Curated annotation (Swiss-Prot):
Protein's name according to its UniProt entry: DNA-directed RNA polymerase subunit beta'
Keyword Signal included in the entry's annotation: no
Species assigned in the record: Marinobacter nauticus (strain ATCC 700491 / DSM 11845 / VT8)
Pfam families: RNA_pol_Rpb1_1, RNA_pol_Rpb1_2, RNA_pol_Rpb1_3, RNA_pol_Rpb1_4, RNA_pol_Rpb1_5
GO cellular component: DNA-directed RNA polymerase complex
Function: DNA-dependent RNA polymerase catalyzes the transcription of DNA into RNA using the four ribonucleoside triphosphates as substrates.
């Protein structure tokens, strides 16, 4: 037995390797793999079921069918191992060699490999510089190609059809050589002199001017160099030998009834062999050319189908009309080799069952059914039984276990003790979807799960199933306990908030016990300590919610762990005192002295984790849960029909609304309103009515009369009935956050309100009934409409969200923390996140858990740093920074980290799931992908149509301050008018209001032409209007003073005058050039400023004060009017921007991560300079920007785009010229990486924030880092890179370092932004890319370039079956690398000498 095991071990001794290379197999290589040639298409003999000799299953070639037994049965058993039987020619070996031994087919004529021919760009085409159509014409025998023109007028590579060929033959005889088919292509490929071609192209590229040609050349140069450096031979793209897959990988299985189930590959191979044999025979017989040609073409098609069926022409189908699965189909797609067998394997020692709730379990436990445990731990039990001598053999032990003897259960108990098991619930969207627990044996067949981990698993008990896995090795058990135990996963990796938070019944119980009730039994009692209160409550002398005084003991723990106790008497309720009893030391009483709604409980656990540590938090969470369940049971809260109180005002409100709607219908009927206006008004009326009803309903629900202990209503001091917060069950459930919401209660006891159609538009007739009254048939049908769409959406959403997660994981999987500190001082500038003038996310929340990149200063004091650079900002530091009034902080970020492979611990900051600085080896890429992908299912799928209420919001025309404070003006350019007010003349100005601490509470953008009534540093009260502007026109402002002089303003030609009927004022409007008479087409009307003597006025910044007027501009002043500084010279009407659909939810997130260019994107200024307009073309305007000292830059802009800039203005690089959705590529090019990071982060956060999902910024930054891996070379300098190449940034850095070291010119480059799909496919590792998408393309490209995969990422290592280079696996990889470096150094003579002398000294 032992011998056999050793033999098996010796079989799979794999060599250690550090990289995998993919390349082209030469015919000799294929023959060297092969164990024999397959000559016949037969598979097995249908009578004897034995494989046919020389067939596709031949035992002589591929090995024996039974272990250690030849086919004829002459040699059996182990002792003949390795003997080759002389009768049947089969080697005696293990049958499993049939999985690894390959055969081959010698092809009678060469055949082009379809991947290199048809997968775009065609590699053969690039090498021969021919189009794919031409090559196909040669390959499929339609035309001849000249291989060697000899001394004739023909060219090498020229195509000739039959007639031309015969003409040429007559003319030149056999001077030249022209052939057709794959042999011609092979000959041409073999004739290429790679080095010469490369040199020629390298010389040619700098001499060409046309962009397209350079592109074409560099493509060809790339592939030629690839062949040159990888050592692949171009001729190998045309095969002469075809390898045959080992037979056990394409099995043939006899079914009952004499039929066979076979792999499609066998059919495809049979076709190839049949055609090949026929071709051989035809060639021997010297058959006519046309027949041979036809056979060769059929052979080519057969091999094509075998390699990649359906790639060319129609796919070959089997008997049942479905296309046969070719070799390419075997490896690609979800069912292919990569995703089905290499990245996702099924494992032994696992089971699954339904889950039920286990409320009495501790947090680290789960209930495991005895039956399952017995099955899962069987081998352990066998070994223990044998060890103890209770069973003599494994077989006896098996019997004992099957009989379930008493001793077996005792042993099971021992085996299971302290042996953690893993529980997994599909879908595993983030790492908390698999956690470790200690099993507790239970009766029954369902797994019991601790209620507090349900949130992490997203599990409920309506029939969910979970899988159990057993970690076998000691290391696995250790990791399960130290890293995966549910007690170690209290915080969510996505945002650092606790994820072990009570929900539903527990929240309800805790809320009920911490509410206060007026006039309850025992109100006003005083207790010496909590225990006394507990006794009184147990004796029924005081109510749980009674307001009492209790003396509590508070323990304060300072940072060094010193404890100080203090006692005080607090006003509280009995329930809160009881709750405080289980709170760990170090937390103040205030934290529980309020009704514990869900938010408060979450905050309590968070504070507990930060102040009392992990261990206490876990114990506390359990106690909290037990207590919550206990009091939820004691409360007796239940829902009755009467709890849904319908407010009596409802009916009046509904009637009033109906009357209003009738009026509007009448107005519409008499033609006073349009259809759209009527629709909007009706919907407005019903929304308002619905709001009023729900308000009345909530008021009614949330208040109730106080009833004393004697059952009588209690009167207040003024003699009125005393009211208190309601104890209505429905209200308590919603208020505590246990279940339900105001919106749901509204549907139950208010009115259901307006319903939506599937396309998102709102149906005019609302549902006035609620669920308590019941819906009539019409109402029921209206509500089914939207509900169905909801269900369909959910299904789609899940699939889309899963796909997004997969792409995210794929792009970020190889990002691991690899070093402590990369030493950069770059970072991102963090500011509070503003929306609509309000601070939505304060600065503190954004920088918590990050490392400062530069010293942090307050806005007032720029000398003394509040926090030095390189500090990890924890809760205490953040609080200090906020108190100091800091308004911006530079923090280190994943995007600016300079670590080569991976990222450094400092740039990442805090590990959110653990609360301390991140460890080296943490797979931050995958964590980021999971954190962004996991909430994906909560995002909406729809695009918001701006309609109804949203689109009629009045345009903003002023800034009204919400809080009092100090005015701060940011990058303001302004002109002071005569009355002292300021006029804004820059486009990127902003106004902020800071409070006493210096924190900016509000933040507003100031448009061009806004008039400010305050200056920088002024104090303002809340509610003051500080700025005004006209939202409908864009002003042109005089930056100098003088007299207006009209230029080219000719009535009826360039301008038209209109007089206002009411005021009598006349306005001049500039006519659009399209509508002008011929004489005025090219004239540009303008207003010039002149001084009193008629001389031109100079502008302060240089240049004359002349204002060109664009089309439709309005001028209200007369010629010769006096103009002061800051006056409005002319106004340009702004068409209200068309309402665009806002893409929201998941599609928006996907668009951002895929870096898609939006339609009609914003146009940004490419350089800084002065704006002017050039000659217009049809449908386009020509915008020219002229910088101070450089050439002008021109851009053509479609006429329908509205511009924000006007003639003669100065713009800064990257400023918006025409509004629209931002294009991330432009932001990166013009404003840089930091701005891009800010843009993508904010945009994605906006989508998630709308759904109430909190994700830390750094996860998004990690993904953005991966999207920015590639750069485009703009100038190669003296490096080996090519201009226009796209390469990894690390590669450029290494090249530049080499260049700098040799005092050569380094390469210059531009950062590129790739979408996540593209970035995944462009990774260094071909294994990772191939297992993601477009497998064929990735492998083809990899093979041609002879790519090496250094197995740096996680995915590649999973595929080759190694530990991943992250977490505990990183140590293994580092150790291997260290050993390898040592081996490379080898032993020097000095080392030997030293060792010898040491040895001699020791002996003496």
């Amino acid at each position: 037995m032992k011998d056999l095991l050793n033999l098996l071990k010796s079989q799979n001794q794999s060599k250690e390797f550090d990289a995998i290379r993919i390349g082209l197999a030469s015919p000799d290589m294929i023959r060297s793999w092969s164990f024999g040639e397959v000559k016949k298409p037969e598979t097995i003999n249908y009578r004897t079921f034995k494989p046919e000799r020389d067939g596709l299953f031949c035992a002589k070639i591929f090995g024996p069918i039974k272990d250690y037994e030849c086919l004829c049965g002459k040699y059996k058993r182990l002792k003949h191992r390795g003997v080759i039987c002389e009768k049947c020619g089969v080697e005696v070996a293990l049958a499993s060699v049939r999985r690894e031994r390959m055969g081959h087919i010698e092809l009678a004529s060469p055949v082009a490999h379809i991947w290199f021919l048809k997968s775009l760009p065609s590699r053969i085409g690039l090498m021969l510089d021919m189009t794919l159509r031409d090559i196909e014409r040669v390959l499929y025998f339609e035309s001849f190609i000249v291989i060697d023109p000899g001394m004739t007028t023909l060219e090498k590579g020229q195509l000739l059809n039959d007639e031309q060929y015969y003409e040429a033959l007559e003319e030149f005889g056999d001077e030249f050589d022209a052939r057709m088919g794959a042999e011609a292509v092979k000959q041409l490929l073999e004739d290429i002199d790679l080095q010469a071609e490369v040199d020629a192209l390298r010389e040619e590229i700098p001499q060409t001017n046309s962009e397209t040609k350079i592109k074409k050349f560099s493509k060809r140069l790339k592939i030629l160099e690839a062949f040159l450096y990888s050592g692949n031979k171009p001729g190998d793209m045309v095969m002469t030998v075809l390898p045959v897959l080992p037979p056990d990988l394409r099995p043939l299985v006899p079914l009952d009834g004499g039929r066979f189930a076979t792999s499609d590959l066998n059919d495809l191979y049979r076709r190839v062999i049949n055609r090949n044999n026929r071709l051989k025979r035809l060639l021997e017989l010297n058959a006519p050319d046309i027949i041979v040609r036809n056979e060769k073409r059929m052979l080519q098609e057969a091999v094509d189908a075998l390699l990649d069926n359906g790639r060319r022409g129609r796919a070959i189908t089997g008997t049942n009309k479905r296309p046969l699965k070719s070799l390419a189909d075997m490896i690609k797609g979800k069912q292919g080799r990569f995703r089905q067998n290499l990245l996702g394997k099924r494992v032994d020692y696992s089971g699954r069952s339904v889950i039920v709730v286990g409320p009495y379990l501790r947090l680290h436990q789960c209930g495991l059914p005895k039956k399952m445990a017995l099955e899962l731990f069987k081998p352990f039990i066998f070994s223990k039984l044998e060890h103890r001598g209770l069973a003599t053999t494994i077989k006896a032990a098996k019997k004992m276990v099957e009989r379930e003897e008493g001793v077996v259960w005792d042993i099971l108990d021992e085996v299971i003790r302290e042996h953690p098991i893993l529980l997994n619930r599909a879908p595993t969207l983030h790492r908390l979807g698999i956690q470790a627990f200690e099993p507790v044996l239970i009766e029954g067949k369902a797994i019991q799960l601790h209620p507090l981990v349900c949130a992490a698993y997203n599990a409920d008990f309506d029939g969910d199933q979970m899988a159990v896995h057993v970690p076998l090795t000691l290391e696995a058990q250790l990791e399960a306990r130290a890293l995966m135990m549910s007690t170690n996963n209290v915080l969510s990796p996505a945002n650092g908030e606790p994820i072990i938070v009570p929900s539903q019944d527990v929240v309800l119980g805790l809320y009920y016990m911490t509410r206060e009730r007026h006039a309850a039994l025992g109100e006003g009692m005083v207790f010496a300590d909590v225990k006394e209160a507990h006794r009184a409550y147990g004796a029924g002398q005081v109510d749980l919610q009674a307001k009492v005084k209790v003396r509590v003991k508070e323990v304060a723990v300072d940072e060094d762990g010193n404890r100080t106790e203090s006692f005080r008497i607090v006003d509280t309720t009995v329930g809160r005192a009881l709750l405080y009893d289980i709170v760990p030391d170090g937390l103040p009483f205030e934290i529980v002295n309020k009704p514990m709604v869900k938010k408060a409980i979450s905050n309590l656990i968070n504070t507990c984790y930060r102040d009392a540590g992990l261990k206490d938090t876990v114990i506390f969470a359990d106690q909290l849960m037990y207590m919550g369940y206990h009091y939820a049971t004691r409360s007796g809260i239940s829902i009755g029909f009467n709890d849904f109180e319908i407010p009596p005002e409802k009916y009046e409100l509904v009637d009033a609304a109906s009357d209003e709607v009738k009026d509007i219908e009448n107005q519409y009927a008499s033609g006073l309103l349009t259809q759209g206006e009527k629709y909007n008004k009706v919907i407005d009326i019903w929304s308002r009515a619905n709001d009023k009803v729900s308000k009345a309903m909530m008021e009614r629900l949330s208040k109730e009369q106080v009833i004393g202990p004697d059952g009588q209503p209690v009167k207040g001091e003024d003699g009125e009935d005393l009211m208190q917060e309601s104890f209505n069950s429905v209200y308590m459930m919603a208020d505590s956050g246990a279940r339900g919401s105001a919106a749901q209660i509204r549907q139950l006891s208010g009115m259901r309100g307006l319903m939506a159609k599937p396309d998102g538009s709102i149906i005019e007739t609302p549902i006035t009934a609620n669920f308590r009254e019941g819906l009539n048939v019409l109402q029921y049908f209206i509500s089914t409409h939207g509900a169905r769409k909801g269900l369909a959406d959910t299904a789609l959403k899940t699939a889309n969200s899963g796909y997004l997660t997969r792409r995210l994981v794929d792009v970020s999987q190889d990002l691991v923390v690899t070093e402590e500190d990369c030493g950069t001082d770059e970072g991102l500038l963090m500011t509070p996140h503003i929306e609509g003038g309000d601070v939505v996310v304060p600065l503190g929340d954004r920088v918590l858990g990050r490392v400062t990149a530069r010293d942090v200063f307050t806005p007032t004091d720029k000398d003394n740093a509040v926090v030095p650079a390189g500090t990890l900002l924890d809760e205490k530091t953040v609080e200090m920074v906020e108190r100091a009034g800091v308004d911006e902080i530079w923090v280190r970020s994943a995007i600016t980290c300079e670590t080569r492979h991976g990222i450094c611990s400092k740039c990442y900051g805090r590990d959110l799931a653990r609360g301390h600085q991140v460890n080296v080896g943490e797979a931050v890429g995958v964590i980021a992908a999971q954190s962004i992908g996991e909430p994906g299912t909560q995002l909406t799928m729809r695009t918001f149509h701006i309609g109804g209420a949203a689109s009629r919001a009045s345009a903003v025309d002023n800034i009204q301050v919400k809080h009092g404070g100090t005015v701060r003006l940011h990058n303001l350019k302004s002109i002071e008018k005569t009355d002292g007010s300021l006029v804004v003349v820059s486009r990127s100005s902003a106004l902020a209001i800071a409070d006493e601490q210096g924190r900016e509470r509000e933040w507003y953008k100031l448009p061009y032409g806004a008039v400010l009534s305050v200056k920088n540093g002024d104090q303002v009260e809340a509610g003051v209007v500080v700025a005004k502007w006209d939202p409908h026109t864009h002003p042109i402002i005089a930056e100098a003073k003088g007299t207006a002089k009209f230029v080219n303003m000719e009535e009826g030609i360039t301008v038209r005058t209109q007089a206002d009927e009411l005021t009598g004022l006349s306005t001049m409007e500039v006519i659009d050039p399209k509508e002008r008479p011929a004489a005025g087409k090219d004239i540009r009307p303008a207003i010039q400023l002149v001084d009193d003597s008629g001389e031109e006025v100079e502008l302060p910044g240089g240049g004359t004060a002349i204002f060109f007027l664009p089309a439709n501009a309005l001028v209200t002043m007369a010629n010769g009017a006096k103009i002061e500084l800051g006056d409005v010279v002319a106004r340009i009407p702004q068409e209200s921007s068309k309402t665009r659909d806002i893409t929201g939810g998941l599609p928006r997130v996907a668009d951002l991560f895929e870096a898609r260019r939006p339609k009609e994107s914003a146009i940004l200024a490419e350089i800084s300079g002065v704006v002017s307009f050039g000659k217009e073309t049809k449908g386009k305007k020509r915008l020219v920007i002229t910088p101070k000292d450089d050439d002008a830059y021109e851009v053509l802009i479609p006429k329908h785009r509205q511009l924000n800039v006007f003639e003669g203005e100065t713009v800064e690089k990257g400023e918006v010229i025409s509004d629209g959705p931002s294009n991330p590529h432009d932001i990166l090019r013009l404003l840089g990486v930091v701005e891009l990071a800010k843009y993508i982060t904010n945009e994605i956060q906006d989508v998630y924030r709308l759904q109430g999902v909190v994700i830390n910024d750094k996860h998004i930054e990690v993904i953005v880092r991966q999207m920015l891996r590639k750069v485009e070379i703009t100038d190669p300098g003296d490096t080996t890179l090519l201009s226009g190449d796209q390469v990894e940034i690390t590669q450029v850095m290494e090249e530049n370092e080499k260049a700098n070291a040799a005092d050569k010119e380094p390469a210059r480059f531009e950062r590129l932004l790739l979408g996540i799909t593209k970035a995944s496919l462009a990774t260094e590792s071909f294994i990772s890319a191939a297992s993601f998408q477009e497998t064929t393309r990735v492998l083809t490209e990899g093979a041609v370039t002879g790519k090496r995969d250094y197995l740096r990422g996680l995915k590649e290592n999973v595929v080759v079956g190694r530990l991943i280079p992250a977490g505990t696996g990183l140590a293994y990889h580092n150790e291997r690398r260290r050993k390898r470096d040592l081996e490379e150094q080898g032993v020097t003579a000095a080392d030997v000498e030293e060792a010898l002398s040491a040895e001699l000294n020791r002996e003496s």
